[in-house]
Amino acid sequence: MEIDKNVDTLSEGQVDELIKKNIIMTSLEAVFNWARGNSLWPLSSGLACCAIEMMATGASRFDMARFGYEVFRPSPRQADLIIIAGTLTWKMAPAIQRVYEQMPEPKWIIAMGSCACTGGPFADSYAVVPGVDKVIPVDVYVPGCPPRPEALLDGFLKLKAKIQNPAKVGLKHGK
């Protein structure tokens, strides 16, 4: 369709076509959620054997950098995601809670492995927290003992979808 550059001569249908092809209508919140979902800065909390699989996820074979998640942060003040990987004990729980409180908003949590999700084989122990969600809120659970790097990548993608589409999962403003 040939469109005249003079706006005065455009019909309503031509204007609608130009809008569909050249203008993106969105909200600033949607842009922020898109950016947040594509550039998560994780803080690793490797408490057991799941940490080895988390390290493998960052290696070249699985390349989590292609999703924008390669920048593991050393400080909770710089991170927006904690990956709790492994067994959480009641003695360690206050430290994890303190780290969670030090993170800026919005913040997300991935529970990686059976131990982090439910306490795993140690759930009946007096010293083990039967799931990280008893201490801090969890956004995505990655089951397995230990979960493969592909499962952690799937967890990242599920979290990305949750961040970018907060209305679909009942969130307000991404959290």
Swiss-Prot record:
<comment type="subunit">
    <text>NDH-1 is composed of 14 different subunits. Subunits NuoB, C, D, E, F, and G constitute the peripheral sector of the complex.</text>
</comment>
<keyword id="KW-0472">Membrane</keyword>
<protein>
    <recommendedName>
        <fullName>NADH-quinone oxidoreductase subunit B</fullName>
        <ecNumber>7.1.1.-</ecNumber>
    </recommendedName>
</protein>
<dbReference type="GO" id="GO:0045271">
    <property type="term" value="C:respiratory chain complex I"/>
</dbReference>
<dbReference type="GO" id="GO:0005886">
    <property type="term" value="C:plasma membrane"/>
</dbReference>
<feature type="binding site">
    <location>
        <position position="145"/>
    </location>
    <ligand>
        <name>[4Fe-4S] cluster</name>
    </ligand>
</feature>
<keyword id="KW-0479">Metal-binding</keyword>
<comment type="function">
    <text>NDH-1 shuttles electrons from NADH, via FMN and iron-sulfur (Fe-S) centers, to quinones in the respiratory chain. The immediate electron acceptor for the enzyme in this species is believed to be a menaquinone. Couples the redox reaction to proton translocation (for every two electrons transferred, four hydrogen ions are translocated across the cytoplasmic membrane), and thus conserves the redox energy in a proton gradient.</text>
</comment>
<keyword id="KW-1278">Translocase</keyword>
<dbReference type="GO" id="GO:0005506">
    <property type="term" value="F:iron ion binding"/>
</dbReference>
<dbReference type="InterPro" id="IPR006137">
    <property type="entry name" value="NADH_UbQ_OxRdtase-like_20kDa"/>
</dbReference>
<dbReference type="GO" id="GO:0015990">
    <property type="term" value="P:electron transport coupled proton transport"/>
</dbReference>
<dbReference type="InterPro" id="IPR006138">
    <property type="entry name" value="NADH_UQ_OxRdtase_20Kd_su"/>
</dbReference>
<dbReference type="GO" id="GO:0051539">
    <property type="term" value="F:4 iron, 4 sulfur cluster binding"/>
</dbReference>
<keyword id="KW-0813">Transport</keyword>
<keyword id="KW-0411">Iron-sulfur</keyword>
<keyword id="KW-1003">Cell membrane</keyword>
<comment type="similarity">
    <text>Belongs to the complex I 20 kDa subunit family.</text>
</comment>
<dbReference type="GO" id="GO:0048038">
    <property type="term" value="F:quinone binding"/>
</dbReference>
<feature type="binding site">
    <location>
        <position position="50"/>
    </location>
    <ligand>
        <name>[4Fe-4S] cluster</name>
    </ligand>
</feature>
<dbReference type="GO" id="GO:0050136">
    <property type="term" value="F:NADH:ubiquinone reductase (non-electrogenic) activity"/>
</dbReference>
<feature type="binding site">
    <location>
        <position position="115"/>
    </location>
    <ligand>
        <name>[4Fe-4S] cluster</name>
    </ligand>
</feature>
<feature type="binding site">
    <location>
        <position position="49"/>
    </location>
    <ligand>
        <name>[4Fe-4S] cluster</name>
    </ligand>
</feature>
<dbReference type="GO" id="GO:0009060">
    <property type="term" value="P:aerobic respiration"/>
</dbReference>
<keyword id="KW-0408">Iron</keyword>
<dbReference type="Pfam" id="PF01058">
    <property type="entry name" value="Oxidored_q6"/>
</dbReference>
<keyword id="KW-0520">NAD</keyword>
<keyword id="KW-0004">4Fe-4S</keyword>
<dbReference type="GO" id="GO:0008137">
    <property type="term" value="F:NADH dehydrogenase (ubiquinone) activity"/>
</dbReference>
<keyword id="KW-0874">Quinone</keyword>
